[in-house]
Design a protein with these regions (language model features):
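N-terminal Rossmann-like NAD(P)+-binding subdomain of aldehyde/semialdehyde dehydrogenases
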Residues: 2-107, 135
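ALDH superfamily catalytic-core signature
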Residues: 5, 12, 130, 208-332, ...
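Glycine/threonine-rich beta-strand-loop-alpha-helix active-site module
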Residues: 93, 158, 529-642
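Rossmann-like NAD(P) dinucleotide-binding subdomain of oxidoreductase/dehydrogenase enzymes
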Residues: 97-238
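Carboxylate- and glycine-rich phosphate/diphosphate-binding segment that chelates Mg2+/Mn2+
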Residues: 277, 610-720
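Conserved C-terminal structural/oligomerization subdomain of aldehyde/semialdehyde dehydrogenase
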Residues: 322-458
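ATP/NTP phosphate-donor binding region
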Residues: 459-545, 816
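Gly/Pro-rich interdomain helix-loop hinge
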Residues: 735-824, 864
């Protein structure tokens, strides 16, 4: 009876192999993380030296194993990978603290990305292995290679050489590993293994796409289809020499090498002759072009035939059945255009080059763009020209991440030989080529940079008008100003009651005898229409001095006119936008260059004469917008108390309570400082001591004190800013026709109580270390001598004192008493609360309000009575 022999089929656990490699890699990572910069640098230097020592042996192995390329050129590649790469990365800080900016309080700390999967091509097997191993270990990352199967032995030999050197120098045993039995399955499992942190991929489109599909932060690069444009201004001999150098280097296997030359018609024949003079063969007949195309490209014409990649021009010509001299270095296919109908205009990775005539510069650029679109987006483009403007235009138009000028593409693209680009054997193609990077990959791409940011206080400031004049008769300063054309902005009352004439008389005593133009149509709560109306007069008159005379409305309107006069392209839409930091605002108002701006207040309230603020009502939506920019700060403020002696009692009360609100809000602002708090406190003290008397008797002392308090409070809030009392007042005052100061008086007690409660949303400002509005209010109460044993009691004492002061000055302290109906309030309150939140003053409030909380404050003030 015959015995049947059953053949044993050997099975191999691919997944188990990958698991083992990954686990060893993770252990190696722990070891590498313990090494310092000096140790890492020593290890990588030893790797470089070891690879350099064996560069010839590895080159020979690569050529013998793959059958592709040129031994001598591969030796140069290996030297480049070990010498140039080491030189480029040797001083890179990749361990621990790599950068510290003590002024900014920023410390950058480098950490390894983790275990890397390195995929290498058959075209540059040993040099790419050396390169990737060195940049991986330089950044303390273990690397596990998946080599191209056709270059497994030479690639593994390169890895073994640098591994042995690394381990001998102190690196962990498994810091460099590789798949010993290569397969598509093994590469896929390695790239997708959970321990693998990133994929460093060099190869064909399919492999790179697989790397990006892993869901890991892959560093893969795309294919090239490099156009080289030789213009009529080019140095022909140099350009042709560069092309020979590039296309014959390792038989054209560097992906950055030129795939077609586009030549201006004027020098087309000269270029051909230069090529022919140096053993190029021009393929121009239809029959030879067809043969070459059949040999070089796959049948569908969409990709190069792998069988010719890296072979000599003579070998490829023989395959194509084209007789060429034995010394032929380069095959040049003369074709008519770029596109699918011209397969030889695609990437060829061999000493085969397409040549296309351009009848104009525009056509030349178009053909280069078409080359990239056909299959080289993001990679490399070359121009040979002495026209520097054209070099820049080429760079702007080409969708390539390496734009090389008067340079051989193969040697230029990898960097640091013909230019100062980062040396690399992995060339990023950016979003054009569906890559995550657009530069040459190096060690900098293989670290996680942790940023340690120390808390800092923003630099603060104290900005005021350069000149502030005060005391009675300080208006006489106008007699000495340098002026030829003075624009006076005021309201009708200033003309009616003689204040405008007072200014005019001072100017008439000025030896410069300035011309004077008056705009006196400013209304309460000035609108953009008023500003634009005044601007027309400004533009016609062209003043070199602007004087704002009156209350806040006149000064604010004048600021708006001044702003637009100085810079007509200023946008009110931009100027009204809210900001978190005045120094970083998205819209910047430019400083004045034409006219000096002088403010002379005739009421004691707004402080606008010393502030960078102007409140303007948009004529389109009837909303008050506080404009804020230090470009709006006046050049001169004249605080002359004689101008406020006849202000009516009701106006004095309203403006005085506005002063109090300025002072209290600036004191508790998140931006309050030692420079502003003293001014705030003194202004508060003056208001409580003199406002009631100023309203009821109008005596000179109290009026002067209140005038000074107004400016002092203005100085404080010009630098510390305000809070939500003003945010709400800006919106409800305009909507309900209530004077601004009176609106603040009604709101302030409720805002104090609200701000003093523990916040639901904390304010954001670095210098504001913790919530302290309650204690700030309590400090004010103590300063005023108010009663209270606890912080809460002192806060309530302050709120009550504010309310009582309002009553004492004749203000009815609720909305209802101002003629507002509940129905009207309910109909508008939601919109007004939102607008108040949007107001610029909200950002400096000691706690961030919710819109619902602003609404509650408004509601509470409707019929409130103490």
């Amino acid at each position: 009876m015959a015995t049947k022999t059953v053949e044993k089929i050997e099975t191999f656990d691919v997944a188990g192999m990958i698991d083992e490699l990954a686990i060893k890699g993770a252990q190696a990572l722990k070891g590498l993380e313990k090494l310092n910069q000096e140790q890492i640098d020593h290890i990588v230097h030893e790797m470089s030296m070891a690879a350099l020592d064996k560069h010839m042996m590895l080159a020979k192995m690569a050529v013998e194993e793959t059958g592709r390329g040129i031994y001598e050129d591969k030796a140069i590649k290996n030297m480049y990978a070990s010498e140039y790469i080491w030189h480029a990365i040797k001083d890179n800080k990749t361990v621990g603290v790599i950068n510290e900016d003590k002024e900014a309080g920023i410390v950058e700390i480098a950490e390894p990305v983790g275990v890397i999967c390195g995929v290498t091509p058959t075209t540059n097997p040993t040099s790419t292995t050396i390169f990737k191993a060195m940049i991986a270990i330089k950044t303390r990352n273990p690397i596990i290679f998946a080599f191209h199967p056709s270059a497994q032995q030479s690639s593994a030999a390169a890895a073994k050489i640098v591994l042995d050197a690394a381990v001998a120098a102190g690196a962990p045993a498994d810091c460099i590993q590789w798949v010993t039995k290569p397969s598509i399955e093994a590469t896929g499992l390695l790239m997708n293994h959970p321990i693998i942190a990133t994929v460093l991929a060099t190869g064909g489109s399919a492999m790179v796409k697989s790397a990006y599909s892993t869901g890991k932060p892959a560093l893969g690069v795309g294919p090239g289809n490099t156009p080289a444009y030789i213009t009529k201004e080019a140095k022909i001999k140099r350009a042709v020499n560069d092309l020979f150098l590039s296309k014959t280097f390792d038989n054209g296997m560097i992906c950055a090498s030129e795939q077609a030359i586009i030549v201006d018609n004027e020098v087309f024949n000269d270029v051909k002759e230069e090529f022919l003079a140096h053993n190029a063969y021009i393929v121009s007949s239809k029959s030879e072009l067809a043969k070459l195309e059949a040999a070089v490209m796959l049948p569908d014409g969409h990709a190069v035939n792998p069988k010719i990649v890296g072979y000599s021009a003579k070998h490829i010509a023989d395959l194509a059945g084209i007789k060429v001299p034995a010394e032929t270095k380069l095959l040049i296919a003369e074709i008519a255009g770029v596109g699918p109908e011209y397969p030889l205009s695609r990437e060829k990775l061999s000493p085969v080059l397409a040549m296309i005539k351009a009848n104009s510069t525009e056509e030349g650029l178009d053909l280069c763009e078409a080359m990239l679109d056909l299959g080289g987006l993001g990679h490399t483009a070359v121009i040979h020209t002495e026209d520097e403007a054209l070099q820049i235009e080429f760079g702007i138009r080409m969708k390539a991440c390496r734009i090389l000028v008067n340079t051989p593409a193969a040697e230029g693209g990898i960097g640091n030989i013909y230019n100062e680009m980062l040396p690399s054997l992995t060339l990023g193609c950016g979003s054009y080529g569906h890559n995550s990077i657009s530069h040459n990959v190096s060690a900098v791409d293989l670290i996680n940079v942790k940023t340690l940011a120390k808390r800092r206080n923003n630099m603060q400031w104290f900005k005021l008008p350069p000149k502030v004049y005060f005391e009675k008769n300080s208006i006489t300063y106008l007699q000495q100003i340098k002026a030829k054309r003075v624009m006076l902005v005021c309201d009708p009352g200033m003309v009616q009651f003689g204040y405008a004439d007072l200014v005019r008389k001072q100017l008439e005593k000025n030896p410069n005898d300035p011309r004077i133009e008056v705009f006196s149509d400013v209304e309460p709560n000035p609108s953009t229409n008023t500003v634009y109306k005044g601007l027309e007069i400004f533009n016609n008159f062209q003043p070199d001095v602007v004087i704002a005379l009156g209350g806040g409305s006149a000064m604010d309107a004048a600021k708006g006119m001044w702003m637009f006069f100085e810079h007509p392209d200023t946008s009110f839409f931009g100027a009204k936008q809210k900001f978190l930091d005045i120094r970083k605002r998205a819209y910047k108002i430019e400083y004045a260059e034409k006219a000096t701006f002088i403010c002379i207040p005739t009421t004691s309230g707004t402080g606008s004469e010393v502030t960078p603020f102007a409140v303007i009502t948009d004529s389109d939506d009837h909303t008050k917008y506080p404009l804020a920019d230090y470009a709006l700060t006046p050049d001169v403020a004249i605080i002359d108390p004689q101008l406020v002696m006849s202000v009516p009692a009701s106006v004095t009360a309203d403006t005085g309570m506005d002063v109090l609100t300025h002072a209290i809000e600036s004191y508790v602002s998140v931006m309050a400082s030692d420079y502003t708090r003293g001014l705030s406190l003194q202004a508060i003290k003056i208001v409580f001591e003199y406002l009631e008397k100023s309203v009821k008797t109008g005596d000179a002392e109290s009026r002067e004190k209140m005038h000074n308090a107004s400016t002092m409070a203005g100085m404080a809030f010009a630098n510390a800013f305000l809070g939500i009392s003003h945010s709400i007042a800006h919106k409800v005052g305009g909507a309900w026709g209530i004077p601004h100061g009176r609106t603040n008086a009604i709101l302030l007690p409720h805002v104090i109580r609200y701000n003093a409660k523990d916040p639901q949303k904390h304010a954001m400002f670095p210098k504001y270390d913790f919530f302290r509005a309650d204690s700030d209010y309590a400090d004010i109460a103590r300063f005023l001598g108010l009663k209270g044993n606890t912080t809460a009691e002192l806060v309530e004492s302050l709120a009550s004192a504010v309310y009582n002061l309002g009553i004492a000055t004749g203000i009815e302290m609720n909305w209802q008493s101002q003629g507002l109906t509940k129905k009207q309030m309910d109909a508008e309150i939601d919109h007004l609360a939102e607008k108040a939140y949007e107001d610029q003053c909200t950002t400096a409030n000691p706690k961030e309000p919710l819109i619902s909380e602003l609404k509650e404050i408004i509601e509470t003030a409707y019929d409130y009575k103490a």
